[in-house]
Design a protein with these regions (language model features):
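Helix-turn-helix
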Residues: 41
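Aromatic-flanked redox-active Cys/Sec active sites in thiol-based oxidoreductases
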Residues: 8-12
């Protein structure tokens, strides 16, 4: 049974809904999912998980949230090399530029989905199904 961390920040609840669906997919596939906020994850946490899904919505001019999530991610970024990770988040406008930039930052890691998983606004059932698929994929990776 693989232990998967799902580390996310959500301002409106959309990215939180994605995180919960990813956790559901992990559990349905027989894994263990640990949901946590950015203040609960450090670079030392990597050793406890087979994979980590990081989730953050697009903020401002298509950037990561910069008060909680951004500083945490900046701190763990040097340890990403060779780690199994996935990226996900929601957005309200634009075309996903923040996710493309974020994926490029993570080039040294083993990205489960090289393009990340993005959903526009509140996830619908189709979007939640994609999140569950991501969770199952992480549990079986």
């Amino acid at each position: 049974m693989k232990n998967i961390a799902i580390v996310y920040w959500s301002g409106t609840g959309n990215t939180e809904a994605m995180a919960n669906a990813i956790a559901e997919g992990v559990r349905e596939a027989g894994g263990t999912a640990a949901l946590m906020g950015p203040s609960e994850f450090t670079s030392d946490s990597f050793r406890n998980y087979a994979a980590v899904a990081f989730g953050c919505p697009a903020m401002g001019a298509e950037e990561l949230e910069d008060l909680e999530f951004g500083p945490m991610f900046d701190a763990v970024e040097p340890q990403l090399s060779g780690k199994n990770i996935a990226l996900f988040g929601s957005y309200g406008w634009g075309d996903g530029e923040w996710m493309r930039s974020w994926c490029q930052r993570c080039a040294a890691a083993n990205l489960f989905q090289p393009e990340g998983l993005i959903l526009n606004e509140t996830p619908d059932e189709e979007g939640l199904a994609l999140c569950r698929e991501l969770g199952a994929g992480l549990a079986n990776w």
